[in-house]
Amino acid sequence: VVFRTAMSPGIREQNDMFPMIANLEGKMVVGQFGSFIHGFKEAYDGTIEEGDLFLTTDPYACNGAISHINDWLLLRPIFKDGRLIAYAAMFGHMTDVGGKVPGSLPTDAREIFEEGIRVPPLKIFKNDELQADVLNLILHNSRMPTWNRSDFNALVAAMRTAEKRVIEMAE
């Protein structure tokens, strides 16, 4: 899904993305780099409900699952019959997220704030409704908002596909 719909070369050409499915305890079931669910849950102090989808760009909020702010990490709790059964997650490298240089990869950065907008774990979807004001705030801090929106939509589509497949397997 992501390769067919993403716009940025980081995802389409360099395959700079990572899908993962984890069980209820947060242990990786499918993926290659390990699970960051525990770190994510420690950094997020709100509720986890059906219809939520979370976003972070903060490498410190997910046990280093992403290495810099250009990586947008999405996490989807998967519910079946009102009960949390698993998690789907994916990160994708965005082309530009603000910061002091185009591409948001300053080689001379002395602190993370020079890389671009740092987003702590937050609900970007509540009850399956996009929090458009939050996404627009993030996109307004990019030199490539159209690409980032398209790539974000590709990641969301991947989360929904993973959710559907996990629920099918659980039936």
Model-derived features: where do they sit?
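Gly/Pro-rich active-site capping loops and adjacent beta-alpha segments
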Residues: L84-N141
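Intrinsically disordered, low-complexity terminal regulatory regions
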Residues: V1-N23, K27-V29, N148, F152-V156, ...
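Solvent-exposed alpha-helices and their adjacent loops that cap or buttress functional pockets
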Residues: I11-Q14, D45-I48, I66-I69, D81, ...
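N-terminal leader/propeptide and maturation segments of large enzyme subunits in energy/redox metabolism
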Residues: R118-E171
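Short, basic/aromatic recognition patches
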Residues: V1-Q14, D45, L55, P59-N63, ...
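A short, hydrophobic, proline-anchored segment that marks a local hinge/packing element in signaling
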Residues: D71-D81, A89
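Short acidic, glycine/serine/threonine-rich loops at helix termini
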Residues: G31-G34, G64-N70, A89-M90, V97-G103
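Regulatory sensory and allosteric helical modules in signal-transduction proteins
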Residues: L24-G31, H38-N63
